[in-house]
Each structure stands twice: as structure tokens, then as C-alpha cells.
């Protein structure tokens, strides 16, 4: 058929550093290079080479507040017969606040930029954020509520969207 053979080999080399600064700031950061080569065929999928990195930070400025920051650049698989994969860059930030042992608030934001490898269209940026509240009734039961926003900007109006979601629930922990 016309579907390409997706067999490939991938090599990724990274070096990194892990740290703990005064038991308040923890982190792991790596940087490297990756390459993926597809077998010679018709249609040919484009080989991919790119800078890669992964950053994870956790900061506890107080015993009630935690800030998490993550960044990643990599290549993910795709099922498209025209595209070798999506090169993506992702960043997230989340803040947890625990004013009492029974109450948790989380605010988070994220953004991801996708760049399909092998075509000039299809770039997309997805972004979003959420607010979460959880009240723990006891060791097994809690009540949660979340408001989330997500959106996508692309050069194709069919694939762009914006949405707001609201959810509430009761959680049983086994």
C-alpha cells in the first residue's frame, strides 16, 4: 500500500545535573541531541535530528506552598502517513497551596508547540490552565472541584479550538 513503513531507529544522548539546594529547591536538568532515521522507501519519511532537553524543578518556599516547573523538547510518534513525527516543546507550571491538612488548592498552566516533521503546515500551539480545589472529609473521602481552560491555535481553522470545562466530584480512596 501507500502507507510508509514506520520502522526506524532512534538515538538520544543527554547529559544532566540533579541538585538539592537547602532542601527547598530540587531539580533535574538534562540537555542533549536526538536523531531518528527511517528506512529507505517510497514514500520516504524524513529523518529527524534535534536538540532535546528535560527540566524538572520543585520549589518549596514554605511548608504550605509548592511550585513545580517542567520543560521538555522531544519528538513524539504520529499515525500520519505523511509525517515522520511531531517535534514538540512543552512547558508547565503548577502551584499547590495547602492552608490546612484537609484543604488543597492547585493552579496550573501549560503550553505545547507542535511542529510536524516533513510538512510545512500543521504547526500548532496548545495552551491551558486549571484551578483545582480539594477538601478531604476524612482519610477515605474527599470532594473536588476543577475549572479548566484549553485552546489550540493552528494554521487550520478546523483544528483550532477553545474550551472551558467545569467538574465536581466525590473521591473515594481505597
How would you label these PLM feature ranges?
Residues 11-15, 31, 51-55, 89-93, ...:
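Hydrophobic, lipid-facing positions within transmembrane beta-strands of outer-membrane proteins
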Residues 15-19, 23, 59, 97, ...:
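Residue-level signature of outer-membrane beta-barrel architecture
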Residues 133-136, 142, 162-174:
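Outer-membrane beta-barrel "beta-signal"
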Residues 67-116:
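C-terminal structural cap/anchor segments
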Residues 23-29, 63-69, 101-107, 135-147:
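Repeated loop/turn-to-beta-strand initiation elements of outer-membrane beta-barrel proteins
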Residues 11, 33-37, 71-77, 111-115, ...:
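Transmembrane beta-strands of outer-membrane beta-barrel pores
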Residues 1-54, 58:
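Acidic, glycine-rich loop-and-beta core segments that form the ion-binding/anion-interacting portion
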Amino acid at each position: 500500500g501507500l502507507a510508509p513503513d514506520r520502522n526506524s531507529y532512534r538515538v538520544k544522548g543527554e547529559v544532566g545535573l540533579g541538585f538539592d539546594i537547602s532542601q527547598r529547591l530540587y531539580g533535574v536538568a538534562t540537555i542533549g541531541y536526538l536523531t531518528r532515521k527511517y528506512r529507505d522507501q517510497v514514500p520516504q519519511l524524513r529523518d529527524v535530528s534535534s536538540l532535546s532537553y528535560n527540566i524538572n524543578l520543585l520549589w518549596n518556599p514554605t511548608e504550605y506552598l509548592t511550585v513545580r516547573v517542567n520543560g521538555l523538547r522531544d519528538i513524539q510518534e504520529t499515525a500520519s502517513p505523511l509525517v515522520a513525527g511531531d517535534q514538540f516543546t512543552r512547558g508547565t507550571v503548577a502551584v499547590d497551596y495547602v492552608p490546612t491538612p484537609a484543604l488543597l488548592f492547585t493552579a496550573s498552566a501549560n503550553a505545547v508547540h507542535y511542529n510536524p516533521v516533513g510538512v510545512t503546515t500543521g504547526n500548532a500551539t496548545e495552551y491551558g490552565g486549571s484551578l483545582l480545589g480539594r477538601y478531604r472529609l476524612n482519610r477515605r473521602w474527599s470532594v473536588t472541584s476543577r475549572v479548566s481552560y484549553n485552546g489550540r491555535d493552528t494554521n487550520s481553522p478546523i483544528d483550532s479550538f477553545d474550551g472551558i470545562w467545569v467538574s465536581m466530584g466525590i473521591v473515594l480512596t481505597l
